[in-house]
Amino acid sequence: MNAISAIITAAGKNRRMRQDLKDRKIPYRHKLCLEIDGEPVLSRTIRNVLDAGVGECLVVLGHYQEELLPVLDEIDNQRLRIIFNPDRDVELSQTLLNGVLNTNSDYCLCVAADQPSVTTSTLKKLLDTLISSAEPENTISILARRTVGQLESAEGLGMPFACHRDILMRFLPRDADNLNPILRKMIREGVKFYGVPHQEEVELLNINRYDDYLKVLEHLKNE
């Protein structure tokens, strides 16, 4: 897997979690610093990605980077690289593009930092599916939300996914937007999409709100 660069986006505003914590009168912590079995969410996501066998793992920071850097400082792995958005107030596509521009590989594994419940096994499946596809340079292997296998629509889809760097370089510079509209544009313009099934329902969960965090904790407790 040395030909794979992982990009983890960790540059968002954390707006919904901040509001949830305020409403619940819980002391503020960045959602990526909340802990799962004593491990910060961000660290767990990074560990799952590194264990998938990638050659490098780029974490792209923007908003609230000062809160996340101490977590990253605790990770001792030469494959980990920290990238900073030049402008913090950008869309997700621009954060992802900043990561792509700093990669050293032909293929990219793209993951959101608030997806600690996506297992290493599922991430490996995304990579294996891409590399073994008939057209790896024109294919996106993506965690399926509804349909699995060959996809005709990107509705509801987002990270994690794996694809050739050139696909991202073709589409990301064209639109400063959230990711799903760009994925839908890719599929309209002939990029092949293959939906990989999840192993557990919780893998489909991004930790955006405090209830999401509690669901992840409950799932892990019952494992």
What residue spans do the PLM features occupy?
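Short beta-strand-to-loop acidic/aromatic patch adjacent to the donor-nucleotide binding site
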Residues: D106-D114
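N-terminal nucleotide-binding beta1-loop-alpha1 segment
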Residues: M1-I26
